[in-house]
Amino acid sequence: MKKLLLVLLTLTVFNTTLVAKKTKVDTTFTFQNFVPSSPDAVKEFHRTKLLGSSRIEYPSFSGNNQVVTAMNKEMDKFINDFKETKNYVYKVTYSVTGNNAYFVSVLFNVERKNKTTNETLTYNEAISFNAKSGKALLMKDIFVQNYESALNAAVNDRVKQFGITTLDEKKRKFEGVDKKQKFYMEDDAIVFIFNQDEATDFGDKQLFIPFILTDLIGLLK
């Protein structure tokens, strides 16, 4: 009888372990039940890397091993785009604009210097991460299917509110947001980035279009 109970207990433990291994945590990104004030998902550490004569400041992350490993890998790949080339050298700084239980977002300020003319172009790049998986977030990850028309209508309305004249030339026409749109997120907002020759000739020719997340209910996942 004791042997039988031992066998049954062993089988129960084995089956429980097997079920646990088969059960995967859903890491799909969603804003459902989103709490902007939720605790930071990761800890951020300032890093500086020299790639040739390019100087790149960027964050590395610590926390959940599996998640931060993915984030740091994505970040290394991202900053590699700023390595010195035959024609250009880069100076890059950053700020972490959002860090909560749902996402981590980083905004980069980039100065690209032409090594021949010494002319400097300043622009912005950004990368955001799913705090559950560590994967970089794209537009398709945060917006529902077929979001483009409704979102661009909201973007155009916001541009009109700002009173900004957008590019309307054949080769330089403002087309609104697209699938590869640059953006960064704050804990309660998303900001779309348009660098020079992408949206306007006004001021420094860069355009940032912000939306409070609650303004986009119905479009966000």
Q: Which residues are covered by each model-predicted region?
A:
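Compositionally biased intrinsically disordered regions enriched in Thr/Gly
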Residues: 20-221
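Sec-dependent N-terminal signal peptides
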Residues: 4-13
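C-terminal segment of classical bacterial N-terminal signal peptides
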Residues: 13-19
